[in-house]
Amino acid sequence: MRKGLRATAARCGLGLGYLLQMLVLPALALLSASGTGSAAQDDDFFHELPETFPSDPPEPLPHFLIEPEEAYIVKNKPVNLYCKASPATQIYFKCNSEWVHQKDHVVDERVDETSGLIVREVSIEISRQQVEELFGPEDYWCQCVAWSSAGTTKSRKAYVRIAYLRKTFEQEPLGKEVSLEQEVLLQCRPPEGIPMAEVEWLKNEDIIDPVEDRNFYITIDHNLIIKQARLSDTANYTCVAKNIVAKRKSTTATVIVYVNGGWSTWAEWSVCNSRCGRGYQKRTRTCTNPAPLNGGAFCEGQSVQKIACTTLCPVDGRWTSWSKWSTCGTECTHWRRRECTAPAPKNGGKDCDGLVLQSKNCTDGLCMQAAPDSDDVALYVGIVIAVTVCLAITVVVALFVYRKNHRDFESNIIDSSALNGGFQPVNIKAARQDLLAVPPDLTSAAAMYRGPVYALHDVSDKIPMTNSPILDPLPNLKIKVYNSSGAVTPQDDLAEFSSKLSPQMTQSLLENEALNLKNQSLARQTDPSCTAFGTFNSLGGHLIIPNSGVSLLIPAGAIPQGRVYEMYVTVHRKENMRPPMEDSQTLLTPVVSCGPPGALLTRPVILTLHHCADPNTEDWKIQLKNQAVQGQWEDVVVVGEENFTTPCYIQLDAEACHILTENLSTYALVGQSTTKAAAKRLKLAIFGPLCCSSLEYSIRVYCLDDTQDALKEVLQLERQMGGQLLEEPKALHFKGSIHNLRLSIHDITHSLWKSKLLAKYQEIPFYHIWSGSQRNLHCTFTLERLSLNTVELVCKLCVRQVEGEGQIFQLNCTVSEEPTGIDLPLLDPASTITTVTGPSAFSIPLPIRQKLCSSLDAPQTRGHDWRMLAHKLNLDRYLNYFATKSSPTGVILDLWEAQNFPDGNLSMLAAVLEEMGRHETVVSLAAEGQY
């Protein structure tokens, strides 16, 4: 009997003690109520049972081995839902909160050989009629509930839907005719269906695989992009949508890639068609470079050009009449001549035939012959000997003079070399022997430059209007020359020393120093206020340069999992780091580097810079430039002219631009005015000395680009110089109208002060401001007080562009002889945080962000997806950039984070999602601080 109980317990998955409590104890109660005889009969049975039962370990909750999965009813075919759990005494299905009848369950039960626990598997069948009979907003769903002695466990919900696929596409592709290498976009929105249809594209009935042909790209919302149209891309394209129910094809869109014809080069001019007189010449070209294809336009213009020509007629030469016979000569002949000039041959005409000279005997053969005289021969021999002797004497004298001069020349060279310490030989007199402190080493010498190099500007380039300089004078250039023996030339000023050195040597020194400055590592900035460093992993973070408007957002997931990068962002203030500017171009942002260069990124980082361009982009052509490894500046993208191949995206806000890039490099934003209405913002800041013990008092008016970093640099400079801010800085719109900036001072109390300005105003040339290449550009007004007792200064400063806008500053300051503390309120001392890492760097919590991406990345039939989010956030200028990313919503939210850093306006984001019909309550809770 005990064996039977154990077998029953094993089959049911129950412990022996539990089974005995359930079966034996009630039997004992019944037996005790019967007679004693019956009790005596069963004594043997109870004597066989132990007095106490061992306690089995507690049974675990049921664990689902198989949970029901979502299913689709195709046509009228029912679907089966399966569920398996262990240990489980019972499993039932609950559909739409109602229990499914026991008879509708198909149960399979077995014992796991390893654990000895009961494994129960249940299935039910769902018909189309059951699903259609459900009323309400929620889809038909079912879930399993499993029991054991320890309790119950519920499975996940499995939704059962009726599968279908509409016949009509919501948007079908349209045929296009495009030129060669143009980007092509074919749009397709598949029919509504459950489950959502998968989309593929056919090219002439062949499936397009973007992996095999990288010229094709299929976006996340099913559009087909041909990056650069080729002749082979001329074809019929079809959008195919399919799911488990059906397969639909859109109408065919024909893409024709045409080639406009181009002229070949002109052939050579033909010869004039007239051999005598007026005619014409012609040259031809053909429309074959390239020839028009697929309906491309034929070449415009003429294929033949003709010009008039005149060919001079040939003139044959004719003889003039014979001249008279000459007198009879010693040889008893006389002659006569004629010329071929009546007319002379011209333009290819024939020359005259015959003799030019004609001679004949003039004595009729009676001429006398004389023998040569011996005296004449002796005379000729004497002359030859005399000439030979003279030539020999001349050669000897010349050789002697040459050797003497050659020895003197070598001596001069040695002396010159000694004076110059091994430099190029120059002619220096003996009176200048005091130039060297010790005798130089003539065997080895070298030149070394010590000290800073400054650009040499002509005085005529400055603003010639007052004795108060607009720009502070540059320090003198000092150069030392060292030789191998340690002798040093005295420190002369630039003009004197340049006269001793050759121009080539001076230029070489300057160029070498500039090259050394250029090759310095970008990450080793000496000024920590211009650089931010940080260590980041896949959680991302933020790098901020305080008070500069420059930051770098590293989104979560941008750095590959398992990698750690030492990243930096730095502002370059040296002029040799700025890109070259053309006439109408201007620098709109500081030059900023981010690194490390070449780092592998899996999604774009966002570099934020303050810019000084007026928001009206129609007057601007704004382009992003980056500096290559060789130091050359290259164009990256023009705002408004992006295409599929552009590596960066620029979001231009009113005061900042956000650069989305996967390439860490050196960047700058350059603007080119397309109209004279284009304007850039200037920041006008006025400074004066913190203390003044003399009669003169200088006021400096800075005209800066309206960026935080430009003002920060001037504030730091003035703090070092002991200056103070006299008035709150003001902005000025400076138009590209080629008009100068005019500065003037008014309403001075003449009984206390007098201006040393000779003219009524000062002007800064237009191009000095517009190019943006001159840092810390300022103008100085020097006032003189008539007495040291005068401590109050009241005046007005007017700064305006000629025929443009202006600003007026009302100054009312106290002149102190004792220095006081420098107060620069525009530099926020609390802004010392440069690095924020991990989730704390972002406003949107990571779980909420993941939910938003999963719900908005997939295209929706009503458009309530990432495209509408971009439109609501005003980030929809070029949606194709986001469409090429694996998670468009994630990139849009990254850009929103960069725009709203550091505050983060989550309530605004929640309101946008509410307008889209996305009731993201978690975002609302986070906006209210309840997350």
Curated annotation (Swiss-Prot):
A cellular component term, taken from the record's GO annotations: filopodium
Concerning PROSITE patterns, the annotation shows: IG_LIKE, TSP1, ZU5
Q: Which SUPFAM superfamilies match?
A: DEATH domain (SSF47986), Immunoglobulin (SSF48726), TSP-1 type 1 repeat (SSF82895)
Q: Phosphoserine occurs at which residues?
A: S502
Q: Where does the Ig-like domain lie?
A: 62-159
Q: Where is the TSP type-1 domain?
A: 260-314, 316-368
Briefly state the modifications made to the protein after translation. Answer: Proteolytically cleaved by caspases during apoptosis. The cleavage does not take place when the receptor is associated with netrin ligand. Its cleavage by caspases is required to induce apoptosis.
Q: Where is this region: Required for netrin-mediated axon repulsion of neuronal growth cones?
A: 402-931
The record lists the membrane-crossing segments as 381-401
Domain ZU5 residue range list? 530-673
Name the domain of life this protein comes from: Eukaryota
Region spans: Interaction with DCC: 694-712
Principal location listed in the UniProt entry: membrane
Q: Which residues does the UniProt record annotate as the domain Ig-like C2-type? A: 161-256
Stated family:
Belongs to the unc-5 family.
What does it do? Receptor for netrin required for axon guidance. Mediates axon repulsion of neuronal growth cones in the developing nervous system upon ligand binding. NTN1/Netrin-1 binding might cause dissociation of UNC5C from polymerized TUBB3 in microtubules and thereby lead to increased microtubule dynamics and axon repulsion. Axon repulsion in growth cones may also be caused by its association with DCC that may trigger signaling for repulsion. Might also collaborate with DSCAM in NTN1-mediated axon repulsion independently of DCC. Also involved in corticospinal tract axon guidance independently of DCC.
Specify the protein name. Netrin receptor UNC5C
